[in-house]
Design a protein with these regions (language model features):
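Structured beta-strand/loop patches that form or line metal/cofactor-binding pockets in enzymes
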Residues: 14, 18-48
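Short, charged, surface-exposed loops that flank catalytic or proteolytic processing sites
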Residues: 79-82, 153-157
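Immediate flanking context of iron-sulfur cluster ligation sites
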Residues: 49-59, 125-132, 154-169
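Stable alpha-helical structural segments in soluble proteins, enriched in small hydrophobic residues
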Residues: 109-123
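Active-site- and interface-proximal helix/loop "cap" or "latch" segments in soluble metabolic
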Residues: 35, 44-110
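Amphipathic, charged-and-aliphatic alpha-helical interface segments
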Residues: 73, 139-152
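Local cysteine-cluster metal-coordination motifs and their immediate loop/turn environment
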Residues: 58-70, 100, 131-143, 164-179
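Polybasic, low-complexity association/targeting segments
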Residues: 1-21
């Protein structure tokens, strides 16, 4: 059993900002129900680019719910540009830490803000070459892998799997040549 911080317990048992957001003008989705973690973020952004409100829906564990909850608290009142600077480390720090096997939950929260901001700005994330999906099972993109490795100074395949869930299921993406 994992040891969770008081902040994780609080955000899991009493999550903030849960449910669809009426009037949302940006929505981001990450994860996959097939892998057991999925997150949908709703943002209401002013004409000046300030996030006025944020809510979420998630399917996942205590860490996924807590990461999503704390993210919505963090982004309220921020400009979209400042929200895009939030990393999974910021989310983890706000929660007082997460077990290494649950770091992928903070990465999902970090990734979803980029998806919502892209929708708000009218950018088709699927059109980006960097958005090539590397792990189909966990729906992890090459761009996300590169950033998470850089931000967290990851060195091993096991660390990458803990942080992203890439390679946790069918394992074809970690074999030479991939799928």
């Amino acid at each position: 059993m994992w040891n969770y911080t008081e902040a994780v317990h609080d955000h899991f048992l009493r999550p903030h900002n849960v449910g669809p957001l009426e009037g949302a003008n940006a929505v981001g989705e990450v994860g996959s129900l097939a892998c057991g973690d999925a997150l949908k973020l709703y943002l209401k952004i002013s004409e000046q680019g300030i996030i006025e409100d944020a809510t979420f829906e998630t399917f996942g564990c205590a860490s996924a719910i807590a990461s999503s909850s704390v993210l919505t608290d963090m982004v309220k009142g921020m400009s979209v540009e400042d929200a895009l600077k939030i990393t999974n480390k910021d989310i983890t720090n706000a929660l007082g830490g997460l077990p290494k096997q649950k770091m992928h939950c903070s990465v999902m929260a970090y990734d979803v803000i980029k998806k919502a901001a892209a929708e708000y700005k009218g950018v088709d994330m699927e059109s980006f070459e960097e958005e090539q999906i590397v792990c189909e099972c966990a729906r992890v993109s090459l761009a996300t892998l590169k950033e998470v490795i850089r931000i967290n100074d990851l060195k091993t395949v096991e660390e990458i799997t803990d942080y992203t869930k890439a390679g946790a299921f069918c394992k074809s993406c970690i074999k030479p040549g991939g799928h």
